[in-house]
Swiss-Prot record:
Keywords: Apoptosis, Cell cycle, Cell division, Cytoplasm, Cytoskeleton, Dynein, Meiosis, Microtubule, Mitosis, Motor protein, Nucleus, Transport. It is found in: Cytoplasm, Cytoskeleton; Nucleus envelope; Cytoplasmic granule. It holds the Pfam family Dynein_light. Broadly expressed in tissues including the intestine, body wall muscles, germs cells, oocytes, the rectal valve and cells in the head. Changing residue 62 to S: Reduces mett-10 binding. The lineage of its organism: Eukaryota, Metazoa, Ecdysozoa, Nematoda, Chromadorea. GO terms for cellular component: cytoplasm; cytoplasmic dynein complex; microtubule; microtubule associated complex; nuclear envelope. Acts as a non-catalytic accessory component of a dynein complex. Part of a complex with bicd-1 and egal-1, which is recruited to the nuclear envelope by unc-83, where in turn, it recruits dynein to the nuclear surface and regulates nuclear migrations in hypodermal precursor cells. Probably within a dynein motor complex, plays a role in the cell fate specification of the germline and oogenesis. In particular, it inhibits germ cell proliferation. Regulates the function and localization of the RNA-binding protein fbf-2 in the germline. Plays a role in mitotic and meiotic processes. Changing residue 67 to A: Reduces mett-10 binding. InterPro entries: DLC_sf, Dynein_light_1/2_CS, Dynein_light_chain_typ-1/2. Its main location: cytoplasm. This is Dynein light chain 1, cytoplasmic. It comes from Caenorhabditis elegans. Disulfide bonds: none annotated. Interacts with mett-10; the interaction is direct, and is required for the nuclear localization of mett-10. Component of a dynein-regulating complex composed of at least bicd-1, dlc-1 and egal-1. Interacts with egal-1 and unc-83. Interacts with fbf-2.
Length: 89
């Protein structure tokens, strides 16, 4: 297991949900190597736990500008990997 430091860059989300996002992303990074698979895992877990429709972007270099539901957005790093998770729709 690799110890990845979580650094939250921006969040509009409850503290409990933020911790869930970090925990879920940590699990995804342990299970998968491909960014698309990591994003799919996080998205599906949040759809199950917090109802659809969640969107997840995982990568090392991307820009974004998204519309999200209030209290359903987080952008954070786990080690060198950035994760954007938000609910819309």
């Amino acid at each position: 297991m690799v110890d990845r430091k979580a650094v939250i860059k921006n969040a509009d989300m409850s503290d409990d949900m933020q911790q869930d996002a970090i925990d879920c992303a940590t699990q995804a990074l342990e299970k998968y190597n491909i960014e698309k698979d990591i994003a799919a895992y996080i998205k599906k877990e949040f759809d199950k736990k917090y109802n659809p429709t969640w969107h997840c972007i995982v990568g090392r270099n991307f820009g974004s500008y998204v519309t999200h539901e209030t209290k359903h957005f987080i952008y954070f790093y786990l080690g060198q990997v950035a994760i954007l998770l938000f609910k819309s729709g």
